[in-house]
Amino acid sequence: MSKAQRAEVDVMLRQPQPEGPRSVEEIRAGFRALMARMTVPDTIRTTRTTLGNRPALRVEPHDGPGAGTILYFHGGGFVFGSPETALSLTGHLVARTGFGAHSPDYRLAPEHPFPAAIDDTLSAYRALLDSGEAPSSIAFAGDSAGGGLSITTCLAARDAGLPLPAAIVAFSPSLDATRTGRSMDTKEAVDPVFTRKAVEHTGAMYLAGADPHQPLLSPAVLADLTGFPPLLIQVGTNEILLDDSTRLAERARSVGVDVILDVTADVPHVFQAFAGVLDEADEALDRAALFLSQRIRAAGTPHTSTK
């Protein structure tokens, strides 16, 4: 693990931003430009498709997928991002597990506020089940807002009476729209990505006046996680959303959920996106791939060994 690598990533993320609030279009363009700098494996192929009446990206190994499916939810504060901006993450999970992935292009705020994103991700999961895929062969995964969706989509599926997936992997998930975690303030000085003001700005677009005190918006403090599948949460210490992860893990443990809280020191929000640049990113993705391969195998489905 290299302090020099961590410093390089920190400098990249702290590039000066324009003064004053940015428009939604400027925020989206800036995020696309940042994520275009991330490394995508050359051992995958992508295909545009539809899933649950929404556009989606199908990601597969070049030599074809094994018997397992990752339903991947991209990050972006529910306001920006796309399956393409998350391809460094989806692609590395696919390359490491041999599974195929679907990444739905769920609707974004402010044009489509809560609960549009959850409606779309739940619809994507229904579509996989309706196509004949066994829930034991499906895992949810996501980063940031998409990490939050991996939890809230599972809540919505359980409440709808659907069978739950085999496992969940959440990278730096956003899990508390009430913004009550202590790390929102104690970590602001070391977080190179977010400030409280920034997440409250985009969060307000997603809420559109909705009360944040409800499980589908703040699962870290309000959700009953009873019956959830095994859960892996990966988070860095240099992020204001750290307590979203620690509190959700505590809630999961309290109701008997098999949960791994995987905290990496001195790395930023969704540090896994820096695979190939940051040793900790590659190591975390290796752990996530092993977790997925083991859990889908434990559910009784054939699988491809972790590569």
Predicted ranges, named:
Residues 1-64, 293, 297-307:
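A glycine/proline-hinged amphipathic helix-loop "lid/cap" segment
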Residues 233-235:
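Short beta-strand/loop motif that positions the catalytic acidic residue
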Residues 82-83, 102-137, 275-281:
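Catalytic nucleophile-loop/oxyanion-hole region of alpha/beta-hydrolase
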Residues 247, 253-307:
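C-terminal catalytic histidine-bearing segment of alpha/beta-hydrolase fold enzymes
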Residues 142-154:
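Glycine-rich nucleophile elbow surrounding the catalytic serine of serine-hydrolase chemistry
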Residues 67-76:
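Short beta-strand element of the alpha/beta-hydrolase
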Residues 84-103:
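Short amphipathic alpha-helix adjacent to the substrate-entry channel of hydrolases
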Residues 155-213:
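Hydrolase active-site cap/lid region
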